[in-house]
């Protein structure tokens, strides 16, 4: 029998603004507590990360500000699109994230939603905010790297 290839987790949505506005210090994988209609909407890709962030309340982590559009064929069991959703993390991970946010002034942002072995996972990042000056430096550095790669390809 042939070996099965490992599939890379398929992405549902990316938070492109997070990569632009923040510098990631550390990333983690978290599960989400979702309702059935939310899962069906996510399978269709009906999600918006625009104002999403992670909030800590009473020893739990909550995903706030993410919009999962209502599922078309749901009927009366429709979910609320903008409700806060609980993140599934170990207690020590929550404590570590919460302490680093309070002490170092970092923030926790959602980066990517994806399927992993049939479950929906959220990649979150402990991040430091970038100011306009840092973003411009990053763009310059990327342009220089692209130009050098182009010149090396010509030789």
Swiss-Prot record:
Superkingdom as given in the UniProt entry: Bacteria
Subcellular location: Cytoplasm
Primary site of residence: cytoplasm
Example GO biological process: trans-translation
Keyword field: Cytoplasm, RNA-binding
Gene that produces this protein: smpB
Function: Required for rescue of stalled ribosomes mediated by trans-translation. Binds to transfer-messenger RNA (tmRNA), required for stable association of tmRNA with ribosomes. tmRNA and SmpB together mimic tRNA shape, replacing the anticodon stem-loop with SmpB. tmRNA is encoded by the ssrA gene; the 2 termini fold to resemble tRNA(Ala) and it encodes a 'tag peptide', a short internal open reading frame. During trans-translation Ala-aminoacylated tmRNA acts like a tRNA, entering the A-site of stalled ribosomes, displacing the stalled mRNA.
Name this polypeptide is given: SsrA-binding protein
Family: Belongs to the SmpB family.
GO CC annotations on file: cytosol
GO MF annotation, one: RNA binding
Pfam family, one: SmpB
InterPro entries documented for this protein: SmpB (IPR023620), SsrA-bd_prot (IPR000037), SsrA-bd_prot_CS (IPR020081)
